[in-house]
Amino acid sequence: EISACLVGSEMCIRDSMYPATCRPEDVMQCTLDENYDNYYFTDCLLRGEIPAYMERFYEEKGLHIAVTEKNRKILREGIADWVGYSYYQSSIDSADKENMEQTNSNLITAVKNPYLESSEWGWQKDPIGLRYSLNQMYDRYHKPIFILENGLGAVDKLEADGSIHDPYRIDYLASHIAQLKEAVRDGVDVRGYYMWGIIDLISSGTHEMSKRYGVIYVDQDDYGKGTLRRSKKDSFSWYQKCIRSNGDDLTR
């Protein structure tokens, strides 16, 4: 068990990354970009040191980061006790990505994966990518893991009778939780899962209310107009059932 005095963690955004092809240049570029985008902060916080690949990156860019021995000591002594990250999607990478079809991603654009479906905002849905990332993170750090955000932003329709039918959200959550359970069977020490988010709120990436994540609907539009009345979506009852079964009942 985790000691009661061990409460330090980190929170980061993490997307699984795959090379676009088996061409060595694509594989190497994917490795480098995954280091820069996915591992830099967690390596600092969970290994207690600035990774060598970033030292080289700064040097080649002509950047001098003034890191004192005192700073390095703080990093070494302040290693986080568990891993926390958000997962929404995956992306592919290439040494020639500027010549490939792009899609929207979490705050950035990414190369589109032809094998995956996308949300209305271009985020590519990849439940297997969650299992993949959990295995990667546990193999790298050997620390307990919490998934702190996972969900689907979508346009939800409020029906005349007050109901909101969102089977697409249920499918997204069920498929990701199923893959999380596979990661647990793989031996990954997953301690918790938190979907994003329980109630509709303004999207941080697009600043829209119409991009809804919640299992509770809020009557407000992109311009702040509405009654703010809250209504349960179909996904509310489904997620309630999922929680009560500790993720064992994923039936739609």
Model-predicted segments: where are they?
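Active-site region of glycoside hydrolase catalytic domains
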Residues: 4, 8-252
